[in-house]
C-alpha cells in the first residue's frame, strides 16, 4: 500500500516509522520542508537503535528506510496513493484546508484518514466534496510502542472503509478498536473517570495528591497515580480534554470538571514541562515528601465491626444508643451483617489475628479497643451514628483487596489522634516473615479513596457501553493498551461483581447525593440479571433475524 502522511511532527513521524517498518511505501510531507528532513532523520535513528538492540535486522532497517519517501510538496499529484493519514495540528479549519487540497490532487479512490484526537470526524469530512471517503484513525504517542488505534467512522463514511482500516492496522502489528464519533472517542473518554474523581477527592480534602497517588498505585495497582499522570500529560492538555468531553456530552455529571484546574493552568502549573505541577520537577526541586512513619501502639486491642451495606445504610442492630464521645466508650452492643463490608470484616479479623494483633470478639468493643469499620460506599460517621460506636476511637478501613502492601485508614473529625496512631500501627502489622503494611490516613468520605476511583472508572466505561459507543471487549482492550490499566474497566468491575458494584454505586449516590455517582443502566441491569459487565447482552435486532 502507498500511504501519504501529511504532517511530520511527533505523530506523523511515528506513524511513518510504523507503516514503513510494516512494509508499506510511505510518502512523508509537511508544509515545512525542514520538518520532513528532521522526521526522516528521527525515523532513521529509531530504526538503527532497533538494530543495535537486536529488535530488527540491518536488512529490514535498510528496506524500511528505502520505503520512506520524503516529499517537498504535500499537494503533489499521487495517482498511486491508496491512503492519506493527516497528522497536522488540532484545528478544524486547518484540517479542512489540508483535505480540500488533497481532494484536488489525489484520485477519488484514495481513502482519507484524520489522526484527530478531539475534533469531530463528521465535521472534518463535511468540508469535503465527497465526505464518504474520510474516517478517523487515531494513533497514540509514541506510535510504535502504543499498539492501539481507534478507527472512527464519520456519519457519512462508506461502510467498507472501517474494516479496511482495521485490517491495515492489525496487519501492521497494532490492535484496532471501532469507536463512535463522539467527544474524546474511546480512550480519552474512558480516562476521565480516574482524573475527575481524583480531583473531586482533592476538592473535598480527603487526601493530598501524593496520598491519592499512593492509594491508586498500591491498592488499585495502577502504574501511575492520577496526579503523576496529569503532570506527565500536562495539566493544560488534561484540563482542555476534560472540559471538551464534558461540554460535548452536554454537561454530563459523571464527567464534571473540577474548579481546581483553571487557575493552575493560568499560573503555568502544567507539570513536568514547566517544572511545577502537582509536584515539583528539575534538579533544584525539593525531594518528594516522605510518607510519615508508622507510630503508635501496635499491641492495642482492636474490635472489627460488621456493618451491612446492601442498601447503602447500616443494618447493624444497636442495643442501647448512648455514646460517650468524651471518654470514647460506648454502651451499645454492636451486631449485624451485610453483603458488602461483612466479608471485609471477616477477612480483616483473620489477617490481623494472623499478624498477632489482639482482636476482640463479642458484641461490643472494650473501653480500650480501637474500632475498625470496613466501609463500602458509606462513611465511618454514619456507622458511628447508627451503631452507637465510640466516635473518638472508631475508624474506617477499605475492604478492597490491595494490589500491593497498603491499607487505608479513614478518620472522622471526632477521631482522637492517639487512637488514630494506634489504629495505624495495628493495621501495619503483618504475619511473621512478611513486610509490614504501609498505611495511608485519609479523611472520612463515602467509600474511601480507592472505592471512589474504581467506581468512577467502571461507571464511565459502563456509560460508554450503554451508549453503544464501543463494544465491551473494545472498551477493555483500548483502556488497557491506551491507558495502561492493569485490567479493563468492565472486567475490573466483574472481578468485584456486578451486584457488589451496584451496591457500591448506590451507596455512594445515597451518601453524597451527587449525581456523578448514580448507577448506569448497564450496571443495574446486569446486576439484576446476573450478567457480567463484559457481556454485550441480547439486542432487539438479534431477536428479529436469523
List each model region and its residues.
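NAD(P)-dependent Rossmann-like dehydrogenase/reductase catalytic/cofactor-binding core
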Residues: 22-24, 174-181, 209-445, 449-452, ...
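N-terminal Rossmann-fold NAD(P) dinucleotide-binding loop
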Residues: 12-13
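Rossmann-fold NAD(P)-binding glycine/threonine-rich loop
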Residues: 97-146, 153-166, 369-422
Amino acid at each position: 500500500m502507498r500511504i501519504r502522511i501529511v504532517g511530520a511532527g511527533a505523530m506523523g513521524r511515528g506513524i511513518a516509522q510504523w507503516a514503513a517498518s510494516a512494509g508499506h511505501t510511505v510518502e512523508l510531507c509537511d508544509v515545512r520542508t525542514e520538518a520532513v528532513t528532521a522526521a526522516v532523520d528521527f525515523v532513521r535513528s529509531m530504526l538503527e537503535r532497533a538494530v543495535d538492540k537486536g529488535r530488527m535486522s540491518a536488512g529490514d532497517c535498510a528496506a524500511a528506510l528505502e520505503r520512506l519517501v520524503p516529499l517537498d510538496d504535500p499537494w503533489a499529484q499521487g495517482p498511486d496513493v491508496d491512503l492519506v493519514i493527516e497528522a497536522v495540528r488540532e484545528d478544524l479549519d486547518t484540517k479542512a484546508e489540508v483535505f480540500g487540497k488533497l481532494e484536488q490532487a489525489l484520485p477519488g479512490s484514495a481513502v482519507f484518514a484524520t489522526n484527530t484526537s478531539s475534533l469531530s470526524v463528521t465535521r472534518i469530512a463535511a468540508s469535503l466534496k465527497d465526505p464518504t471517503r474520510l474516517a478517523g484513525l487515531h494513533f497514540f504517542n509514541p506510535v510504535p510502542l502504543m499498539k492501539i488505534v481507534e478507527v472512527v467512522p464519520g456519519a457519512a463514511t462508506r461502510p467498507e472503509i472501517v474494516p479496511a482500516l482495521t485490517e491495515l492496522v492489525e496487519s501492521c502489528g497494532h490492535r484496532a478498536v471501532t469507536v463512535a464519533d463522539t467527544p474524546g472517542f474511546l480512550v480519552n473518554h474512558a480516562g476521565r473517570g480516574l482524573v475527575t474523581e481524583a480531583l473531586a477527592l482533592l476538592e473535598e480534602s480527603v487526601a493530598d495528591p501524593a496520598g491519592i497517588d499512593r492509594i491508586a498505585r498500591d491498592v488499585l495497582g495502577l502504574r501511575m497515580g492520577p496526579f503523576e499522570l496529569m503532570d506527565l500529560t500536562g495539566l493544560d492538555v488534561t484540563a482542555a480534554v476534560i472540559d471538551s468531553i464534558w461540554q460535548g456530552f452536554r454537561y454530563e455529571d459523571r464527567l464534571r470538571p473540577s474548579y481546581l484546574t483553571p487557575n493552575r493552568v493560568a499560573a503555568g502549573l502544567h507539570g513536568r514541562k514547566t517544572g511545577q505541577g502537582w509536584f515539583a520537577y528539575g534538579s533544584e526541586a525539593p525531594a518528594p515528601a516522605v510518607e510519615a512513619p508508622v507510630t503508635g501502639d501496635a499491641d492495642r486491642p482492636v474490635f472489627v465491626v460488621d456493618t451491612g451495606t446492601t442498601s447503602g445504610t447500616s443494618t447493624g442492630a444497636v442495643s442501647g444508643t448512648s455514646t460517650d464521645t468524651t471518654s470514647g466508650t460506648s454502651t451499645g452492643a454492636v451486631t449485624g451483617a451485610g453483603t458488602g463490608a461483612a466479608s471485609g470484616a471477616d477477612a480483616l479479623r483473620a489477617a490481623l489475628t494472623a499478624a498477632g494483633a489482639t482482636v476482640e470478639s463479642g458484641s461490643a468493643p472494650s473501653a480500650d479497643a480501637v474500632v475498625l469499620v470496613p466501609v463500602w460506599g458509606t462513611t465511618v460517621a454514619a456507622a458511628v451514628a447508627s451503631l452507637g460506636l465510640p466516635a473518638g476511637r472508631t475508624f474506617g478501613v477499605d475492604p478492597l483487596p490491595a494490589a500491593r502492601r497498603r491499607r487505608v485508614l479513614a478518620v472522622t473529625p471526632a477521631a482522637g489522634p492517639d487512637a488514630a496512631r494506634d489504629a495505624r500501627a495495628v493495621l501495619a502489622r503483618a504475619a511473621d516473615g512478611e513486610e509490614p503494611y504501609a498505611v495511608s490516613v485519609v479523611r472520612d468520605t463515602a467509600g474511601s479513596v480507592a472505592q471512589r476511583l474504581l467506581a468512577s472508572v467502571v461507571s464511565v466505561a459502563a456509560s460508554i457501553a450503554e451508549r453503544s459507543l464501543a463494544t465491551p471487549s473494545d472498551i477493555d482492550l483500548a483502556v488497557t493498551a491506551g491507558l495502561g490499566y492493569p485490567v479493563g474497566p468492565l472486567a475490573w468491575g466483574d472481578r468485584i461483581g456486578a451486584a457488589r458494584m451496584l451496591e457500591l454505586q448506590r451507596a455512594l449516590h445515597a451518601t453524597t447525593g451527587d449525581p456523578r455517582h448514580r448507577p448506569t443502566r448497564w450496571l443495574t441491569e446486569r446486576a439484576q440479571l446476573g450478567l457480567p459487565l463484559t457481556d454485550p447482552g441480547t439486542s432487539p435486532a438479534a431477536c428479529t433475524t436469523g
